[in-house]
Amino acid sequence: MSESNFIQKVGAACNKKEDLYQKSKTRYAVRSIFAGGFLTLSTAVGAVAADLLNTFVPGSGRFLFPFIFAWGLVYLLFLNAELTTSNMMYLTAGTYLKKIHWKKALEILLYCTFFNLIGALIVAFLFNQTTAFAHVDPKGFLATVAENKLQRSNQVVFFEGVIANIFVNIAILSYLYFKDETAKVLLALSAIYMFVFMTNEHLAANFASFSLLSFNSVSSQLPHFEFLNILRHYSVTFFANWVGGGVLIGLAYAWLNNIKSLYND
């Protein structure tokens, strides 16, 4: 009996990632930069749109922002960018299935994470040179969401992060399994919309929102927007996202499919 579709796709993904990383770390870095950049693009536009909509119907921006943000994930999926939180699923599953050594998987994951942040910082800097970000309101959508996130305890951040990356990797698995392009887009949008609407903690999404604020003078008006607090938040979110996407989705699906059975993915 041949390997399941899931195992074949995870193996191919791990081989592709490791091959590019070994042959050209610069090119792998650029693909990772694109992922952070794409999410920052959609975050910035979503935040501006949410503030505008809130002026007409207070509170309604929370419904619009997740929809616009979710397109950033669609871009990176179709344009082959490297996202840390989806790599948590691929590389954890690949390690369990012996498609990649755990040391190499961890190295690639950390490398990808760093350059996701670099991509977010680059696009955030560019946006902060535009008129749309010339007068960011400390009571506006982006600043309010960021400040609320940075007030959370480690325990709350952890559970929010676990849930976020379950949603994200539901989107990734849907993208892997479905052949119809429209179905891929709709399923990805639905899963991403849900975690963003719930303001769950997603590392790359936080890279985007915190970076946009870091280049803006409004950050000085946010009491919890401090370097060490942001670093704490990133660290807890990274681990939580790995548990949600890497263990509860990646490892679970790898285990489910690591058997000779008619019932596999």
Language-model segments: which ranges?
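Alpha-helical transmembrane segments and their helix-helix packing motifs
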Residues: 1-265
